Curated annotation (Swiss-Prot):
InterPro entries: Rbsml_uS13_C, Ribosomal_uS13, Ribosomal_uS13-like_H2TH, Ribosomal_uS13_bac-type, Ribosomal_uS13_CS. This is Small ribosomal subunit protein uS13. Signal peptide: none annotated. Keywords: Ribonucleoprotein, Ribosomal protein, RNA-binding, rRNA-binding, tRNA-binding. Located at the top of the head of the 30S subunit, it contacts several helices of the 16S rRNA. In the 70S ribosome it contacts the 23S rRNA (bridge B1a) and protein L5 of the 50S subunit (bridge B1b), connecting the 2 subunits; these bridges are implicated in subunit movement. Contacts the tRNAs in the A and P-sites. GO terms for biological process: translation.
Length: 118
């Protein structure tokens, strides 16, 4: 298996699809990485030689992916919570951030219903 950015890339998939296994690489970014590395999008990972995989590694290394990206996102959320701004308060209370209604919906964000004692 090829390892790119610390992730085992599935070998039986096309290059574009396999690159999306990396956190921070979506389909559009995967297409641009393949184009910059000079690798055909329909080539399967198992058919690539070591030089092509190295080119893909170099292109992926130009972006913030995996652990660094996760850390960056969590630090941004923590910063909002420390500031005490509206979005930070909503994060702290595990409520929707972007103005959705919460009287009847938002079950995914709020979690299961809590029974009221009589």
């Amino acid at each position: 298996m090829a390892r790119i950015a610390g992730i085992n890339i599935p070998e039986h998939k096309h290059t574009v699809i396999a690159l999306t296994a990396i956190f921070g690489v979506g389909s559009t970014r995967a297409q641009s990485i393949c184009e910059a590395a000079g690798v055909a999008e329909t080539t399967k990972i198992k058919d690539l030689d070591e030089a092509q995989i190295d080119k893909l590694r170099d292109e992926v290394a130009k972006f913030t992916v995996e652990g660094d990206l996760r850390r960056e996102v969590s630090m941004s959320i923590k910063r909002l919570m420390d500031l005490g701004c509206f979005r930070g308060i909503r994060h702290r209370r595990s409520l929707p951030l972007r103005g959705q209604r919460t009287k009847t919906n938002a079950r995914t964000r709020k979690g299961p219903r809590k029974a009221i004692k009589k």
